[in-house]
Amino acid sequence: MAIILPELPYAYDALEPQFDAETMTLHHDKHHATYVANTDAALEKHPEIGENLEELLADVPKIPEDIRQALINNGGGHLNHALFWELLSPEKQDVTPDVAQAIDDAFGSFDAFKEQFTAAATGRFGSGWAWLVVNKEGQLEITSTANQDTPISEGKKPILALDVWEHAYYLNYRNVRPNYIKAFFEIINWKKVSALYQAAK
């Protein structure tokens, strides 16, 4: 067996004008594909550890040292992107009632949540991700990670993710990351967020 690059659940141009087809093609077919290939290459060196990346990255010290960083970078990159694609929707969706209530309980209002999430995404220096997670206490929390690090390694369950690597937005938004973040909020798959939230509680 091997880790397989998942197909996008929509056409490359389905998220336009927010996310353009050229960016989506490069992002999925080149960047994500490279993470998959490098993950497979690392796992081949230690077939005894299996291929369950979520379990492996939830307990990083148990990953053999010679492939540990490769799996953090590439295995994390694969998991992060596979989730990211599913969290985007060509059709505009309203926030589901369960997630809306949880956001209100945690942050006071949706606007406050959006402001804090945007701050996390904007404030992540260099490359990384912004996240809405369910923490170990079962509460919603906004966080960000560097590079391809995943909240799974901190015992948190991601339910919303935004890639803030420049390759995710530079062709369309150049260096104006806040405009990319604003566009992201227009194409979130809130039904998927709800499903992840229900599973994580």
UniProtKB/Swiss-Prot annotation:
<feature type="binding site">
    <location>
        <position position="27"/>
    </location>
    <ligand>
        <name>Mn(2+)</name>
    </ligand>
</feature>
<dbReference type="GO" id="GO:0005737">
    <property type="term" value="C:cytoplasm"/>
</dbReference>
<dbReference type="Pfam" id="PF02777">
    <property type="entry name" value="Sod_Fe_C"/>
</dbReference>
<dbReference type="GO" id="GO:0046872">
    <property type="term" value="F:metal ion binding"/>
</dbReference>
<keyword id="KW-0479">Metal-binding</keyword>
<dbReference type="InterPro" id="IPR036324">
    <property type="entry name" value="Mn/Fe_SOD_N_sf"/>
</dbReference>
<dbReference type="Pfam" id="PF00081">
    <property type="entry name" value="Sod_Fe_N"/>
</dbReference>
<dbReference type="InterPro" id="IPR019833">
    <property type="entry name" value="Mn/Fe_SOD_BS"/>
</dbReference>
<comment type="subunit">
    <text>Homodimer.</text>
</comment>
<dbReference type="InterPro" id="IPR001189">
    <property type="entry name" value="Mn/Fe_SOD"/>
</dbReference>
<comment type="similarity">
    <text>Belongs to the iron/manganese superoxide dismutase family.</text>
</comment>
<comment type="function">
    <text>Destroys superoxide anion radicals which are normally produced within the cells and which are toxic to biological systems.</text>
</comment>
<dbReference type="GO" id="GO:0004784">
    <property type="term" value="F:superoxide dismutase activity"/>
</dbReference>
<feature type="binding site">
    <location>
        <position position="81"/>
    </location>
    <ligand>
        <name>Mn(2+)</name>
    </ligand>
</feature>
<keyword id="KW-0464">Manganese</keyword>
<protein>
    <recommendedName>
        <fullName>Superoxide dismutase [Mn]</fullName>
        <ecNumber>1.15.1.1</ecNumber>
    </recommendedName>
</protein>
<dbReference type="GO" id="GO:0005576">
    <property type="term" value="C:extracellular region"/>
</dbReference>
<dbReference type="InterPro" id="IPR019831">
    <property type="entry name" value="Mn/Fe_SOD_N"/>
</dbReference>
<dbReference type="InterPro" id="IPR036314">
    <property type="entry name" value="SOD_C_sf"/>
</dbReference>
<dbReference type="InterPro" id="IPR019832">
    <property type="entry name" value="Mn/Fe_SOD_C"/>
</dbReference>
<feature type="binding site">
    <location>
        <position position="163"/>
    </location>
    <ligand>
        <name>Mn(2+)</name>
    </ligand>
</feature>
<keyword id="KW-0560">Oxidoreductase</keyword>
<feature type="binding site">
    <location>
        <position position="167"/>
    </location>
    <ligand>
        <name>Mn(2+)</name>
    </ligand>
</feature>
<keyword id="KW-0964">Secreted</keyword>
